[in-house]
Amino acid sequence: MSNVVNHRSGLMFALCLSTASLSAAPLDEALKPLPAVPVLDPAKVELGRQLFNEPRLSVNNTLSCASCHQLTSGGADNKPFSIGFDGKPVQINTPSVFNASLNFKQFWNGRVDTLQAQVEQVVISPVEMGSDWKTVVRNLSALPAYQNAFEQAYPDGVTASNVQNALATYERTLLTPNSRFDQYVLGNTDILTRQEKYGYQRFKDYGCIACHQGVNIGGNMFQKFGVMGDYFKARGNPLESDLGRYLLTQDEEDRHVFKVPSLRNVAVTAPYFHDASAKTLEEAVDVMFKYQLGRNPSQEDKDLIIQFLKTLTGEWAGKPL
């Protein structure tokens, strides 16, 4: 009898293990969890971290990457428009640096493909850092600490290319894993509330997922702002930055076309859109429904979607953003 009982107990234990394994299996969803933070050359990462916080990259030593991309403020600065080296606001809202390495293009209009090219342009931008690469290299080369750091990371020392590469290497580590939604997709289906799961379903049912999908929940395609209505006419006060990719291509099909922003950490990165016109997540959801989807959802559905969006907030340095 004891052998039979033991056999049955063993079968039940195995079945429980099998059931637990099945319940923990990753979900097959259009939204994918973030990958692990890549393990990169530590000397380059640390040098990139120092350069990220280095105001000598700007022409008057007043502005660093971290001035606008604050890692304690969602990777941006929560301002409508960041302040350039000259004390004047730029004309486009600063996107988060977190998870930027997962975007298929950089900048709102997608004008460059890589983080290195993004760094190159920001430093010489006449409204951002206002410097030039010859000056940057000369200033950094004059500092023994940077001489040593570059020699440890790069055989050829301080060069513009190496500055750009070090910064890009550091930025590739700026991922925000372990959001509650990522844990859900990885198989912990109990971590979301019923309302948050309903919100995710509404997000899919209304078609938000058509543009906001993939590992970065956006950042992987272009889309016109104002598919179902003239957002810019309704807003008024036209800006050059409103033209989007048209500024690059001069193609009418690209007028008001932008890179779809990532929704990761969206609850902590207000204000929203390239023009910072939506001060709250609620306002942003309203605009999306009206001008991108042409839908008129119930307040309950909007509230549920917002609850879902708040589950996309990840962690940085082991702490929730």
Model-derived regions, located:
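Periplasmic c-type cytochrome electron-transfer domains
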Residues: 2-5, 22-321
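Bacterial N-terminal signal peptides
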Residues: 10-21
